[in-house]
A protein has these predicted regions:
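Short, acidic, Ser/Thr-enriched surface-loop or helix-capping motifs
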Residues: 56
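Acidic, negatively charged sequence signal
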Residues: 1-45, 52, 65, 69-72, ...
């Protein structure tokens, strides 16, 4: 902990002002990151468009589209395809969130 002497009457105040400024900057950047994370989505699809899944930032399935070709798939294969694409989309959304948060977590948010 720093100690300030009588010869440095404003040193403590200056340090505190700088600290408050830094904290405010981190708060603003955190809010911006939160807003960006809230808009993250990721979509994965089969090549033929039979199945299209979309997830949010947490990897939660938010949309599932089954094209005409999906009717040709056996039920077990369709279920496996939905699960596989959901995992792929969730990995993509997690990577997006990580890229958004990296500047805040690197070097203590400086």
């Amino acid at each position: 902990m720093e100690h300030f002497t009588a010869e440095q009457p404003n040193a403590g105040r200056t340090w505190l002002d700088e600290y408050r400024t830094r904290i405010e900057s981190i708060r603003v950047r955190a809010e911006q990151a939160r807003d960006r994370v809230a808009t993250v989505t990721a979509t994965a699809r089969t090549r033929d468009g039979a199945v299209v899944v979309t997830v949010d930032a947490s990897g939660m399935l938010t949309d599932l589209r089954l094209g005409v070709r999906a009717e040709e798939l056996p039920r077990a294969r369709l279920a496996e395809t939905v699960l596989r694409l959901s995992r792929e989309a969730a990995l993509d959304s997690a990577a997006q969130v990580e890229r958004i948060m990296a500047p805040l977590t690197a070097e203590g948010g400086q």
